[in-house]
């Protein structure tokens, strides 16, 4: 291997290492604002469901833009860009599912309690239920609010960028775990 080839190889290795560090920065920025919250407290106090701040979105956007413009010398930089988007989506997905989990558990427990009533007639005729006593309405409002907030944040992140074509897969990766957990609970609810 000639000196020029060695130098080029070293330069590519440094670029890949730098790209990986930028991916880690994306994860750190997203993680800093993705600590699970008590959605019931937010919903009952009338506060808007929190989302990523504009400052965080702007910082992540700049990092992603940097990764998307790196030369495709070994195709690893393109991989780093996609990895950064996937990592961002994983962090936000974990935030959503962790934040919704206590309310989902309350809905499931309420549904289980109603279903435990053993009667000979159809459940609807004899199951005691007081309107508003089940946490379903609050859970549904929280679900819709979190999805809307996440969609707004993702829209801001992708707005005006050359990589807008990655929006649908990224938002899908963010919401899929939450929607899958709801789907898994539907037979109980």
Predicted regions and their residues:
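Long alpha-helical rod scaffolds of large eukaryotic non-enzymatic complex subunits
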Residues: 1-189
């Amino acid at each position: 291997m000639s000196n020029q080839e060695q130098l080029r190889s070293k330069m590519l290795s440094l670029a890949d290492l730098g790209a990986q560090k930028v991916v880690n920065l994306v994860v750190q920025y997203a993680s800093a604002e993705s600590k699970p919250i008590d959605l019931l407290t937010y919903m009952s106090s009338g506060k808007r469901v929190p989302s990523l701040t504009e400052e965080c979105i702007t910082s992540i956007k700049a990092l992603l833009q940097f990764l998307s413009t790196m030369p495709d010398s070994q195709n690893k930089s393109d991989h780093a860009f996609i990895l950064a988007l996937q990592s961002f989506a994983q962090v936000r997905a974990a935030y959503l599912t962790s934040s919704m989990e206590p309310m989902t558990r309350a809905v499931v427990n309420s549904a289980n309690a109603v279903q435990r009533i053993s009667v000979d007639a159809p459940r609807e005729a004899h199951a005691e239920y007081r309107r508003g006593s089940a946490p379903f309405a609050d859970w549904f409002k929280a679900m819709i609010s979190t999805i809307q907030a996440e969609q707004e944040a993702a829209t801001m992140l992708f707005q005006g960028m050359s990589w807008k074509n990655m929006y649908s897969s990224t938002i899908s990766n963010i919401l899929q775990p939450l929607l899958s957990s709801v789907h898994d609970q539907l037979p109980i609810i």
